[in-house]
Amino acid sequence: GIIPQISVILGPCAGGACYSPAITDFIFMTEKTSQMFITGPGVVKAVTAETVSPEGLGGAGVHSTKSGVSHFVCKDDKETLEAVRNLLSYLPQSNLEKPPVAEKSKAVDKSKEIEEIVPDNFKKGYDVREVIATFADKESFLEIQKDFARNVVIGFARMDGNVVGIVANQPNFIAGSLDVDASDKASRFVRFCDCFNIPILTLEDVPGYMPGTKQEHNGIIRHGAKAKGASFLIGDSGIS
């Protein structure tokens, strides 16, 4: 974590070339034109007899909803580059600097209060994004991996112009329980924020780790430990 690293995939990316973007901090992909896969459809068919299209194997939709490889998906190249520029506005140039402060931050959206959003009945769900809107500068929340592991919401926001990282359980999706994917998603983001001096705000509303054979067999102990370990990194720069 010396400098933030961003990969922009604007076309097919196959074989060993996939590993380089995979070790960077953020990956952008475009709809219909971006693909990432270790072996292409031809090799897959020859080895496994499975027929699959490039898009179905490693398109933007696959990596933004199933694999979690992609962090942002945009409609075209122009929108992608604009999104990269927007992300950079939240990040420091290196681990020796603090995140940039916005000179003109928009006032907090006070159309709803937290009491109106969070129900008294703990069995009822709500959208945690609405809670974030009650304290973050208006339109400042930049959600990351919004379609992957939707039981956890992560992203950058500004509070009085200052950048913060937000990690929040999403009660609207499987009650905000932590599973393998959510643990990976949250822990990776926390580690990034820790590397680049970004304070973390955690919104906790979680019944626990998701039970069941699927989660146990997929390694919930191993992946869940990542989330637990990452929480120890927050230290004095975090609020829960």
Predicted regions and their residues:
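Ligand-binding clefts of soluble mixed alpha/beta catalytic domains
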Residues: 1-240
